[in-house]
From Swiss-Prot:
Binding site for Zn(2+): 347, 398, 530
Family: Belongs to the class-II aminoacyl-tRNA synthetase family.
GO process annotations (BP): threonyl-tRNA aminoacylation
A single GO molecular function term of this UniProt record: ATP binding
This protein's name: Threonine--tRNA ligase
Subcellular location: Cytoplasm
Coiled-coil annotated residue ranges, if any: none
Alphabetical list of CDD domains matching this protein: TGS_ThrRS, ThrRS_anticodon, ThrRS_core
Pfam families assigned to the protein according to its UniProt record, in alphabetical order: HGTP_anticodon, TGS, tRNA-synt_2b, tRNA_SAD
Length: 666
C-alpha cells in the first residue's frame, strides 16, 4: 500500500498527500479561507464527507456556492428536522427522510399527527439546533449493534430499514451532537453550515413504504436553499403558482371538471370545450397543405400492440378491454374472447395507414397528422388536473421519409414548433438532443448517421435563431428506438415545461414491415419521425391557463366580451350591441340582470372575461360603449363601430393575420 495519495485538481495540477489525509486536510493545504467555506469534497465526481480519507483521483472542493451543495443542505436540514421533532415529542419514531425535487420530507410515527400549527414551533427548534453548530460525525457499526441500539430505543421502523440494507454494505451511523441516525451520507461538516434559508411547507399523511396495508405516518415537507434570496424567490413562485393553478381557474372560468366515476378524464364545459376547439382549429390551420390529417381507430386487437412492442414494453400503462358479454361469460364458446386495447399512442395506426398501398420514393415524405385521443393508465395519486390525465388528445404527426430527407424534415418541424410557441407568447425555449441509450435497437452505424444529422440540425437551430434558442445534449437519454429533440418552454413565472418532441424511430417501420420502392426499384425501410408540438393538448391548455393566469389573449378566450347594462333602459341597445359583435365573429354574452354594475364587473372579472362593454342610457343615446379590460380599473369610451373594428382585429389569431399580411400586395 502506497504511503501517498495522488490528487488531480480542476486546474490540471497534481499533488501528493500522505495516505490517510482527509478532504479537510486537502482544503486546508490550499487556503484557510477555502477550508472554512468547504462543505464536502468530490472525488472522481462522487460527493463525499470532508472527513473522509482521500484516494487517488480527481478532487474538487465543494462549497455552499456549488450547485452540488444544495442536496447536502437539504439532506442535513431533514436530519435536523428529525432531531427537532424527537426533542420536542420524545417517543416519536423517525422513519425515512429523503431529498426530493425542490426540497425534502421526513415521515414520522406519532400517536397524534402533526398539524400545520406545529410547523413554526418545529422551525424555531431547528434554528436552535443549527445555532449549536454540531459537527456531523460518521461511525460504521455492525448490523447486530445497529439492530440492538435502535430496538432498545423503540425505533422499530429503523430496525426494519437496517434489515433491508444489503449484507455487503456497511451500516453507517451519522451523529450530530448526541442525536444519531443510520444514513448513507454524505453530510456537511456541521449543522451550522445549513444556514437559516429553510422552511417547513406542509403536513400530509403517508403509508409506511407507500403500502396502504401498512400504518399511516405523518409526513412533513420542507425546502432549503443556500441563500435567503433563493428561498424567497421560490416561495414567491409557489404563491404565484397557487394563484395560477389551472384547477382553481378552471372552476372560476367554468371550463371543466373531474369526478370519481371518470378518474383522469376531463368533463369539458361549454367554455372549456370552445378553448379546446380553438386550439385544435389553430393547429389544424398550421398543418394545412403540409400534412394529411388522418384518424386511426381507438380500439385495436392486442396482436397489433404485440407486434408494435407496446404490449411487452408498455403493458402496465395500457387499458385492455373485452366485450361486456365476454367479461360476464368467460366460458361461453360463442362469446368473442379477444382482448383489445385502447390505444396509448397513435404511431402504430399511422404505420398501418402508410402501408396501405404501395409507396414510391417520389411520394416521400409522407406526413400524417392526427388529433388522436389516447388512454394511458396513471396511478390515481399521480393524477393532477389537466396536467396528468388518463385520457388525452395528442397533436401527433408522423413523417415517413428517406434518410436524405431527415435533416430537412427535422428543421421544418422545428420551425413549426417554435412558431407555434411564439404565437402563444413563449419566447424562451430550450431544445435538447437526447442521444443513444445503452439498451437500443438498430445498428451503431444507423445511430451514428442519425445522431450526426440531428447534431447538425441542432447547430442550425441555434444559428438560425441568432442564439435566442438555447440548445444542449442529453447523453444516453434517447428512446430505445432512436434519438430525439425535446422542446422545453419557460412560462411567465419561470417554470419550465417540456412539451414538444421530434423523435427518429428505427423500430416501428421494421416491426410492421413498412417500406417504399426506391429509385432502384428495391424495397427500402423509411425513416419514421414522430412529432408532437403541444404533446397532450389538455396539458398544453393547462399550461396556457397558468401562464396567462386565466387572462387569455382575446383571440384565444372562450368568452371574449360581456355586454353589461347599467339600467333596463339600455337593454335593447345592449342586445343590438351583442348582435353586432356576434355578427363580427366575436364570442359574446349579455348581462341584463338587475344588479349594480360593479357587482357585474367583479363577477365577470373572476370568470376572466377579457372585455366588459358597459352600456347605460347615455351610451344608448350616443351609440357608444364603455370598454373595461380585465385587470384594469380604467374605462375607455368609443363608438360602437370603433369598438367592433378594434376588437375584431385583436381577436384575429396571429397565424391568420400573417396569412392576410402575406397576401397584401407590396
Amino acid at each position: 500500500m502506497s504511503d501517498t495519495v495522488s490528487l488531480t485538481f480542476p486546474d490540471g495540477s497534481v499533488r501528493s498527500f500522505a495516505a490517510g489525509a482527509t478532504g479537510r486536510d486537502v482544503a486546508e493545504s490550499i487556503s484557510k479561507s477555502l477550508a472554512k467555506k468547504a462543505v464536502a469534497i468530490a472525488l472522481d465526481g462522487v460527493v463525499r464527507d470532508l472527513a473522509d480519507p482521500v484516494v487517488d483521483g480527481k478532487i474538487e472542493i465543494v462549497t455552499r456556492a456549488d450547485p452540488r451543495a444544495l442536496e447536502l443542505i437539504r439532506h442535513d436540514t431533514a436530519h435536523v428536522l428529525a432531531e427537532a421533532v424527537q426533542e420536542m415529542w420524545p417517543g416519536t419514531q423517525v422513519t425515512i427522510g429523503p431529498v426530493i425535487e425542490n426540497g425534502f420530507y421526513y415521515d414520522f410515527a406519532k400517536n397524534e399527527p402533526f398539524t400545520p400549527e406545529d410547523l413554526p414551533k418545529i422551525e424555531k427548534k431547528m434554528k436552535e439546533i443549527i445555532q449549536r453548530n454540531q459537527p456531523f460525525r460518521k461511525e460504521v457499526w455492525s448490523r447486530e449493534k445497529a439492530r440492538e441500539v435502535f430496538a432498545a430505543k423503540g425505533e422499530s421502523y429503523k430496525v426494519e430499514l437496517i434489515d433491508a440494507i444489503p449484507e455487503d454494505q456497511d451500516i453507517k451511523i451519522y451523529y450530530q451532537g448526541d442525536w444519531f441516525d443510520p444514513c448513507r451520507g454524505p453530510h456537511m461538516a456541521s449543522t451550522g453550515q445549513i444556514g437559516t434559508a429553510f422552511k417547513l411547507m406542509k403536513v400530509a399523511g403517508a403509508y409506511w413504504r407507500g403500502d396502504s396495508n401498512n400504518p399511516m405516518l405523518t409526513r412533513i415537507y420542507g425546502t432549503a436553499f443556500a441563500e435567503q434570496e433563493q428561498l424567497d424567490n421560490y416561495l414567491h413562485i409557489l404563491a404565484e403558482a397557487e394563484k395560477r393553478d389551472h384547477r382553481k381557474l378552471g372552476r372560476e372560468m367554468d371550463l371543466f371538471h373531474f369526478q370519481e366515476e371518470g378518474p383522469g378524464v376531463v368533463f369539458w364545459h361549454g367554455k372549456g370545450w370552445k378553448m379546446f376547439q380553438s386550439l385544435t382549429a389553430y393547429m389544424r390551420r398550421r398543418l394545412a397543405n403540409t400534412y394529411q390529417e388522418v384518424n386511426a381507430p381507438q380500439v385495436l386487437d392486442k396482436s397489433l400492440w404485440e407486434t408494435s412492442g407496446h404490449w411487452g414494453w408498455y403493458q402496465e400503462n395500457m387499458f385492455a378491454v373485452k366485450s361486456a358479454h365476454a367479461f360476464t361469460n368467460p366460458n361461453d364458446p360463442e362469446a368473442d374472447q379477444r382482448v383489445f386495447a385502447l390505444k396509448p399512442m397513435n404511431c402504430p395506426g399511422h404505420v398501418q395507414i402508410f402501408k396501405h398501398g404501395l409507396k414510391s420514393y417520389r411520394e416521400l415524405p409522407v406526413r400524417l397528422a392526427e388529433f388522436g385521443l389516447v388512454h394511458r393508465y396513471e396511478a390515481s395519486g399521480a393524477l393532477h388536473g389537466l396536467m396528468r390525465v388518463r385520457g388525452f388528445t395528442q397533436d401527433d404527426a408522423h413523417v415517413f421519409c428517406t434518410e436524405e430527407q431527415m435533416a430537412a424534415e427535422c428543421l421544418r418541424i422545428n420551425d413549426l414548433i417554435l412558431s407555434v410557441y411564439e404565437d402563444f407568447g413563449f419566447k424562451e425555449v430550450v431544445v435538447k438532443l437526447s442521444t443513444r441509450p445503452e439498451k437500443r435497437v438498430g445498428s451503431d452505424e444507423l445511430w451514428d448517421r442519425a445522431e450526426s444529422v440531428m447534431t447538425e440540425v441542432l447547430k442550425a437551430i441555434e444559428e438560425q435563431s441568432g442564439g435566442r434558442i438555447k440548445t444542449g445534449i442529453l447523453p444516453g437519454e434517447g428512446a430505445f428506438y432512436g434519438p430525439k429533440f425535446e422542446y422545453t418552454l419557460k412560462d411567465a413565472i419561470g417554470r419550465e415545461w417540456q412539451c414538444g418532441t421530434t423523435q427518429v424511430d428505427f423500430n416501428l417501420p421494421e416491426r410492421f414491415g413498412a417500406f417504399y420502392i426506391d429509385q432502384h426499384s428495391e424495397k427500402t425501410q423509411p425513416v419514421m419521425i414522430h412529432r408532437a408540438i403541444c404533446g397532450s393538448m389538455e396539458r398544453f391548455l393547462g399550461i396556457l391557463i397558468e401562464n396567462f393566469a386565466g387572462h387569455m389573449p382575446l383571440w384565444f378566450a372562450p368568452l371574449q366580451v360581456v355586454v353589461a347594462t347599467i339600467t333596463s333602459e339600455a337593454d335593447d341597445y345592449g342586445r343590438d350591441v351583442a348582435e353586432q359583435l356576434r355578427d363580427a365573429g366575436l364570442e359574446v354574452e349579455t348581462d341584463f340582470r338587475n344588479e349594480k354594475i360593479n357587482y357585474k364587473v367583479r363577477e365577470h372579472s373572476v370568470g376572466k372575461v377579457p372585455v366588459i362593454m358597459v352600456c347605460g342610457k347615455r351610451e344608448a343615446e350616443e351609440r357608444t360603449v364603455n370598454i373595461r379590460r380585465l385587470g384594469s380599473q380604467d374605462q375607455v369610451s368609443m363608438t360602437l363601430d370603433e369598438a367592433i373594428a378594434s376588437l375584431v382585429d385583436e381577436a384575429t389569431p396571429p397565424d391568420v393575420k400573417r396569412k392576410r399580411a402575406a397576401r397584401k400586395p407590396a
